[in-house]
Design a protein with these regions (language model features):
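Glycine-rich loop-to-alpha-helix module at the N-terminal edge of alpha/beta enzyme cores
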Residues: 38-127
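Conserved C-terminal structural/oligomerization subdomain of aldehyde/semialdehyde dehydrogenase
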Residues: 38-42, 227, 264, 318-319, ...
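Rossmann-like NAD(P) dinucleotide-binding subdomain of oxidoreductase/dehydrogenase enzymes
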Residues: 129-273, 398
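Hydrophobic face of amphipathic alpha-helices that form TPR/SEL1-like repeat modules
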Residues: 1-34
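Residues at or immediately preceding the N-termini of alpha-helices
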Residues: 34, 48-51, 70, 88, ...
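Short, well-ordered beta-strand elements within core beta-sheets of diverse protein domains
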Residues: 40-46, 61-67, 153, 263-266, ...
Length: 484
């Protein structure tokens, strides 16, 4: 499918959405294909005025949407889920074209995105309240759950569809309306999903979206007293700014922020399984994943075996345009991402790391970087302290369980962690000691619509997905009834 064929599709939108109408602006910004540098769209560059219009539309639509029964909202959500699945092939190609990840991964993300809509279509019917034992005769105490109101969802470029639905699924299920600010690198994926939402029966004004002038959009959202909740996925530094600004109007916040995930391979681990898990986790989306491993800790007795197997497997990974057959590692999102990877690799090598695979820009040039394995890494290197967000596996040695737990926890972040062992006692001991919101044990994937997703320490606030995800969009109201 050519870029022109994508552009001719009914789901290809380039404006901003307010009250069910896609509008254009004279001022636009370019959306680029990270694999080729081609301009694939010129998108309306929205700012303060457009954001205020979007907030007003969401505010006006809120009473009617919250008044719908849970069963009615559930039916609309389920139809949205069906439409996403029906359009999986086209949506996957759109995502690969604007984001870069291999087509198989992109189609997998479409299914993953749809799973949140399906899940919360069911959870919409379970926003239950409570009957509390009264304190005196002739009285009752009831606790009800009600939608919080207008929600602002600020989504990232690395999972432009799944992070959108992980927020909008529970928001709509709860009875909230919203304003969506997708990342400027990947707005087209969000626009396509919102077009399908309208087709599914989401009323005009319930979902609105603006992209463009990030500072103006953010400032308008944070200043509005009508916006009662912020849900953000992105960097810790930006998240902290949003939390500070949210305090001015006491908005509720959900923050899914940065990580520095450890991946511990104990000497009793199944080494082949650990290598397979490392490849699947570290090089998915070219390492541009918030729960991607940043530090591989391998016990001294199995270090050489693990890193040699890992390096051999990494050398066999095919790099290229995600639309090409067999490609498993696509480009990084933009030149600044390449520069950060280069900075981390060069710093590590200068401080004594050994390049076991890759370690330099790919011959394809542009935003491509060779999948890399670095051995003999140690604390003090930039890649040990900062999230690389690229296809670099940094390998560290350790000797004892107590030592590696201390080193794994020696970070302000606590989003995800992983370890491999066949010792059941160690499974419980280490999982309790690791300071992280999610832990994969002999498992490289920790995100599903069924399980709570979120971090501790400076990696976030709140949880997404699961039965807890709906709670983030509800307020509890207590009713004290007398004279019965």
């Amino acid at each position: 499918m050519t870029t022109q064929a994508l552009q001719d599709h009914i789901l290809f939108q380039t404006g901003y959405l307010v009250n069910g109408i896609w509008k254009t602006l004279d001022t636009t910004f370019d959306v680029l294909n990270p694999a080729t540098g081609e301009v694939i769209a010129k998108v309306a560059k929205a700012g303060k005025a457009q954001t205020e219009d979007a907030i007003a539309a969401a505010t006006q639509a809120f009473p009617a949407w919250r008044a719908k029964t849970a069963k009615e909202r559930s039916a609309i959500l389920y139809r949205w889920y069906e439409l996403i699945i029906e359009n999986k092939s086209w949506l996957g190609r759109l995502m690969t074209t604007e984001q870069g990840k291999p087509l198989k991964e992109a189609e997998g993300e479409v299914e993953y995105a749809a799973s949140f809509i399906q899940w919360f279509a069911e959870e919409a019917k379970r926003a239950n309240g409570e009957i509390i034992p009264p304190i005196k005769p002739g009285s009752r105490i009831l606790a009800t759950r009600e939608p919080i109101g207008v929600v602002a969802a600020i989504t990232p470029w690395n999972f432009p569809m799944a992070m959108l639905t992980r927020k909008l699924g529970p928001a709509l299920a709860a009875g909230c309306t919203g304003v969506i600010k997708p990342a400027n690198n990947t707005p087209l994926s969000a626009f396509a999903l919102l077009t399908l939402a309208k087709q599914a029966g989401v009323p005009d004004g319930v979902l609105n979206t603006v992209a463009g002038n990030t500072h103006e959009i953010s400032d308008a959202i944070m200043a509005s007293r009508d916006v009662r909740k912020i849900s953000f996925t992105g960097s810790t530094s930006v998240g902290k700014t949003l939390v500070r600004n949210a305090a001015e109007t006491m908005k509720k916040v959900s923050m899914e922020l940065g990580g520095n995930a450890p991946y511990i391979v104990f000497e009793d681990a199944d080494i082949d399984a650990a290598v397979k898990g490392a490849i699947a986790n570290k090089f998915r989306n070219a390492g541009q994943v918030c729960v991607s491993v940043n530090r591989f800790y391998i016990q001294e007795t199995v270090y050489d075996k693990f890193v040699n197997k890992l390096a051999d497997a990494v050398k066999a990974l095919k790099v290229g345009n995600g639309l090409e057959e067999g490609v498993v590692v696509g480009p990084l999102i933009e030149p600044s991402a390449v520069n950060k990877v280069r900075e981390h690799v060069d710093d590590a090598v200068a401080r004594g790391a050994t390049v076991l695979a890759g370690g330099k820009p790919h011959l394809l040039g542009g935003n491509f970087w060779m999948p890399t394995v670095l051995g003999d890494c140690h604390e003090g290197m930039k890649l040990a302290e900062e999230e690389t967000f690229g296809p670099v596996a940094a390998c560290f040695r350790f000797t004892s369980e107590d030592e590696v737990i201390q080193r794994a926890n020696n970070t302000p972040y606590g989003l995800a962690a992983y370890f491999y062992t066949q010792n059941l006692s160690r499974v419980f001991r280490v999982s309790q000691a690791i300071e992280s919101g999610m832990i994969g044990i002999n498992e490289c994937a920790v995100s599903t619509e069924l399980g709570p997703f979120g971090g501790v320490k400076e990696s976030g606030l709140g949880r997404e997905g699961s039965v807890l995800g709906l709670e983030e969009y509800l307020e509890v109201k207590t009713l004290h009834i007398g004279g019965l």
